[in-house]
């Protein structure tokens, strides 16, 4: 029997145990979160990258219920265009322009107040999903969330869910991305381990030591 620290699923290898947290186990944890929070209309965004196949296999293996999946390009320009299409941004943008014009030409009471309220908004109209899972990391993941925010789809409107980010504290400091949900270890236990490790070795632990 061989113990591997990889987080990838190794097919047809009965004598290899993968110790890493792989995509399948994370998606299964996300499934439990979806059930607890009654999340039913989830879209899954997958980058067109080296680990695309691994994510697709994990989705198939877990049998997670999704509204649909979408493969996106990591090029920022292409990414923004794709997110605009997914979120129907241009339609919702036009909706608010049309509604302002309608009010301007109407005899409705308090129409000026309504118009001023609409002018403070970027879009008008619903979104056809209640949650988005993004299987990406670091700056590429931030680009996806930035595009979602640009299209007026904030974490206050839909659940922002991603894969394991517990070693990247920068996401926790991004106020515009909160609340952000991802499978993780117990934070208190992790902090306790860091303090214990530093006390013994006088240095910060790395991922392998944990």
Q: What are the roles of these predicted feature ranges?
A:
Residues 34-41, 46, 59-63, 87-90, ...:
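Sec/Tat-exported extracytoplasmic proteins
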Residues 1-45, 49-65, 69:
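Extracytoplasmic ligand/sensor domains, especially the bilobed periplasmic-binding protein
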Residues 10-16, 29, 78-79, 169-173, ...:
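Short, charged, surface-exposed secondary-structure boundary motifs
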Residues 5, 20-22, 45-50, 71-74, ...:
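Structural motif
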Residues 12-16, 44, 62-108:
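Short beta-strand elements in bilobed, periplasmic/extracellular small-molecule ligand-binding domains
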Residues 64-66, 84-93, 103-106, 110-111, ...:
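Extracellular/periplasmic periplasmic-binding protein-like sensory domains
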Residues 32-36, 82-95, 99, 116-125:
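Short, well-structured alpha-helical segments in soluble
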Residues 26, 30, 51-58, 75, ...:
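Stable alpha-helical elements in mature extracytoplasmic
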């Amino acid at each position: 029997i061989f113990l591997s620290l990889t987080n990838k699923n190794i097919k047809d290898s009965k004598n290899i145990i993968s110790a890493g947290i792989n995509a399948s186990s994370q998606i299964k944890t996300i499934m439990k979160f979806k059930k607890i929070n009654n999340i039913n209309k989830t879209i899954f965004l997958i980058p067109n990258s080296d680990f695309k196949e691994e994510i697709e296999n994990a989705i198939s293996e877990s049998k997670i219920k999704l509204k649909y999946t979408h493969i996106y390009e990591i090029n920022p320009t292409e990414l923004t265009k794709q997110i605009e299409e997914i979120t129907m941004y241009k339609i919702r943008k036009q909706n608010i322009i049309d509604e302002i014009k309608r009010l301007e030409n109407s005899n409705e009471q308090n129409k000026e107040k309504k118009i001023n309220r609409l002018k403070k908004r970027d879009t008008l109209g619903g979104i056809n999903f209640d949650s988005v899972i993004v299987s990406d990391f670091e700056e590429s993941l931030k680009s996806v969330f930035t595009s979602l925010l640009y299209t007026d789809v904030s974490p206050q409107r839909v659940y922002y869910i991603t894969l394991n980010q517990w070693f990247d504290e920068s996401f926790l400091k991004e106020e515009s991305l909160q609340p952000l949900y991802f499978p993780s270890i117990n934070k208190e236990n992790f902090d306790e381990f860091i303090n214990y490790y530093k006390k013994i070795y006088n240095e910060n632990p790395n991922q392998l030591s944990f």
